[in-house]
Amino acid sequence: MSGVSPTTVSHALSGHGRVAAGTRRRVEQAASRLAYRANPAARHLREGRTGTIGLALPPGAGALSYYLDLALGAARRALGVGLALTLLPDLSRPSEVAAFGLDGVAVVDPGREDPLVTELARLGVPVVTGERQLTAGTGAGPAVETDHREALRELLDHLLASGARTVALVSPPPDDAFVADTLAGYEAWCRRNGIAPLVAEVPFIGQPDQAEGAVGALLGSSSPPDAVVGVPEHSALGVAAVASRLGLTVPSDLLVASCVDSPAHAMAWPPITALDLRPDLAGARLVDALAALLAGEPATAEPVEARLVVRASTLRPPTG
């Protein structure tokens, strides 16, 4: 551009440096006419960054649609804000993360004392989390959270309105915030409604058949529940399969629901009621929180509101 130095052009387009308003407008107009786009790699180099952020999922997460949808949502948002997203493998040693040269990392469903979060804090790498870490003071930044207690309350109230009298929960141990909050919400709801809590323990990440032993004991007991809620993504499918083998009909004999929705729940027969945790939005908000942290903005994160998706598995036909 005639009469304007390369440095001034750079400052005008990047928003840095002192540039007169008129000059900035002329530079921006010229760039628009030329369809000029700044080189993000060069910009990151000037800022002393790589322009790459990491996304760490729990071990085995690739088997679950929730985490895949979250990763896709994060990737789309990263592209939109000029960042590259690297999906981190399950690292055998957390110290291996240093080799990636990441500007920051989003850790999804961190464990109670997550070694990756601890190592990132030691390295001085900015961290945000998908759900808070239960152990305080680990160095993690803001958390993108869902009010799982409130979401579960809405689901359990729906089961009660559908005729349930004894609602059991199929859940892993409370080793992360999602499960801990869900269990706490279930126990509080049971107290308010005068219902004895009934919990069957299953793995956090697994296939439907891995929950079937615990569910079989639950449904085959002398006082079986008339409604079961699965906390892990695939567990409600296991509940429905066991119920069928025991001669129980869903929803006439047993109401079945899930705390995590997936396409498999919509395609099951009958389709299974579930909480849509909106993983694509959660992924996008993780990137937003990390990008703000890298830009030196206040460490905040937008929450994600779950939605109850009612399907046939919890809608009993009218009697009489």
Predicted features along the sequence, with ranges:
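Short acidic capping loops at alpha-helix termini that bridge into adjacent secondary structure
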Residues: T166-V167, P197-V199, V250-L255
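Flexible loop/turn connectors
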Residues: G216-G320
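N-terminal helix-turn-helix DNA-binding module of bacterial transcription factors
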Residues: M1-G51, P318-G320
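Hinge/beta->alpha junction and helix N-cap segments in small-molecule ligand-binding domains
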Residues: P58-Y66, P89-R93, V144-E154, V170-A214, ...
